[in-house]
Amino acid sequence: MYGSRKDSSGSRTPERVSYSPSPSPSSYSTNSSQSSSGRSRVRTAARSVAGVFVACFTPPEEEAPHHSSSAFGGSDAFSSTSDVSGASDSTDGKRLHRSIYTVKSDSTHSKEPASIKFTMADINKATKNFSPVLKVGQGGFGTVYKGQLQDGTLVAIKRAKKSMYDKNLGGEFQSEIQALSKVEHLNLVKCYGYLEQGDERIVVVEYVPNGTLREHLECFNGNVLSLDSRLDIAIDVAHAITYLHTYTDHPIIHRDIKSSNILLTDKLRAKVADFGFARLAADAESGKTHVSTQVKGTAGYLDPEYLRTYQLTEKSDVYSFGILLVELVTGRRPIEAKRELDERITARWAMKKYTDGVAISILDPKLEKSDANGLALEKILELALQCVAAHRRNRPTMRRCAEVLWNIRKDYKEQLV
């Protein structure tokens, strides 16, 4: 992605496709100090639904004929056709207390976000004509290069595959870039500018040198992420997505929240990447509830309701965040095809263990099975279960997720004293 490392694990990164595990609905309190009887009720409710996750590659029963299946193999980064309909899921408090989720520029954020329209000459100079030595990532969307601007600023330059360009989407691309020009948050990778010329679509973003969350979970650098650090990362990501959903001039849906899109700084603070081509959400003031669009995303993280209805809302990001929470505490990828059948879909396996009262057995083996870790683990899984509810109406908002995680971290630190 936008870090300095390439994925050398040999594990196959989940492809961006249309199918994912589909947990059943659940809705209950997110109070981190919930009583044991309350937890029992949660487990009972969850136990009744934990076994009905569908296999991640089972196609939906009905498919809309006007949606092209070719969209499922690539990124949402460079193409989407959409229309808007319905009334907003959650508008309470929208754009209130904006200062909580914004940050003033510092030395690493010296440029105005997305304010520059680069030329091809600028890009060629920054990447030394797309030198293979400077390539730091590759995926369905295209290739990412490390580059340096004239003033010495290090950047990541994301170049789309030529096959993903669609001249009919030029206006939409430009309108979304303009919306993103107003986005600035400490936990979001900054978008410095872009290029749209002929069959080239390129975005220039902040360079974050310490690799991805996925790499750190697999200990590529030899260091184990503590549960304390994992909670910090979860909160950082929750704040970033809350900002996109609630505190921007127009709500933005990330649409591809996953561990390989979370970059870490030298101090292990998280920055959400790959939001430069996210979808603009339905505008609450217009009375719309969702954006209808082709399904794009990554296997294992995809919202089953979005997959079934083609209706995209902020709650699709909440579902992906729930999968990310499970990934954080287990250390496993969302889909691990080489494991035993009942463990291949990590969220299904983890929720089954949680509802059976043996949540500690799914804790990342690199972490200590202490009382404090076990208690925090159960609370995190409780929140994750709500996030992956099959119906979006039963999922919390990202702001609520951030609040719950703050309480979990507070309680966890008190346990450690």
Feature roles, as predicted:
Residues 2-109:
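Detector for long, low-complexity, acidic/polar
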Residues 1-4, 415-417:
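A positional/structural detector of protein chain ends, strongest at the extreme C-terminus
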Residues 84-417:
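Conserved eukaryotic protein kinase-like
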